[in-house]
Amino acid sequence: MEKAIITLSLLFMTTFAQGQSGMQEQINQTALALEQQVIEWRRDFHQHPELGNEETRTAGIVAAHMRDLGMEVTEGVAVTGVIGVLKGGKPGPTVAIRADMDALPVTERNDLLFKSQVSTNYNGQETGVMHACGHDSHVAILMGVAEVLAGMQEDLKGSIKFIFQPAEEGLEDKSVDSWGAKQMVEEGVMEDVDAIFGLHINSQTPAGVIKYKPGPSMAAVDNLEILVKGRQAHGAYPWSSIDPIVTASQIVMGLQTIVSRNVKIIEIPAIVTIGAIHGGVRHNIIPEEVEMIGTIRTYSESQQTLIHRRIREIAGNIAESAGAAAEISIKKMYPVTHNDPDLTASMLPTLEKVAGKANVWLHDPVTGAEDFSFYQKEKPGLFIFLGGMPPEGDSETAPSHHTPDFYLDESGFVLGVRALSQLAVDYMELN
């Protein structure tokens, strides 16, 4: 009896492995066949970029493609978002895969045949519009993934929800409610989802490489505003003033001690940056007020609470000691992008299978942020980085994201198609 059980177990494992191998081969072949189409999609989106909640052309192309693949399609989610649902031929979990669609108010400098042709008025200034963060590639890659998995529909053990999201970069006002992922969650896109996957292309990581990190991967973001109120006076009679410029300067220096003296940086980093100071209109007038704005980056709620408290203490006490007052506003924006440790561990073999073990790198915490974190607050998620730097590139000098010279090596896109497709299939097989 025991021998029979062992034999059946070995037979099951062999059959499972053969099935997995067959599906992997189908994914690889279909992705390779689609490579040029994915590149063409990306070039089209790159030439016709659209800002947050204005992605109507992009969304229309996506929705038409999803319908052509026989999916249930919902448009107008969170303003311009598109959801496509592919129901597999066998019962199982629902896996979500997300791509963001929006571009940035950046004037492109690259001399490409598919260079951006779009300009706009943004916050009162004329500017170009550019896919300067690679979201054009994200959309094209996920369209490729949809086609790969649609061709395997009858063999899928569960359902796939394709999320094409607007406004990852936020809107002009950068309000806490302007992030596309937050709006999508509020409209219920995660209610029937068991796990979610996403990727971000990286222009300073070699094409062919995938980066990952379990736990806190990208920072939480808070917006900081400090208004220092003093007493206005003639610049020739400073003793008559309570100078908010001097006070603001002392506050800026005082804030530098938070990370260097209050945060245990050997465990995890943190950032407090003052990005702008506005005060005064004339060389010989000490103003009444000075406004400072900045950003806070943290990786845990306890770290976030500590930094918020110290900002209020330092700014408030320095202002009070000068006879001034400080009005402090801290708005929570993105949560931490937190890769579920169990999900990450279970999917690591998939990443290594797809890219090769030598090409799967563990990355340090990233001080940038992603609204993918809103999905991860609802369900387990894994967010990876996909290399997009040419082989001859140097990660120290390659043009970074959000710049006019941002550039991607398109040869890395097919790995993104294979990786997201395989993650979805393997998750469904394991769950």
Regions found by a protein language model. Name each.
Residues 32-36, 49-60, 132, 136, ...:
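Soluble non-cytosolic domains of exported or imported proteins
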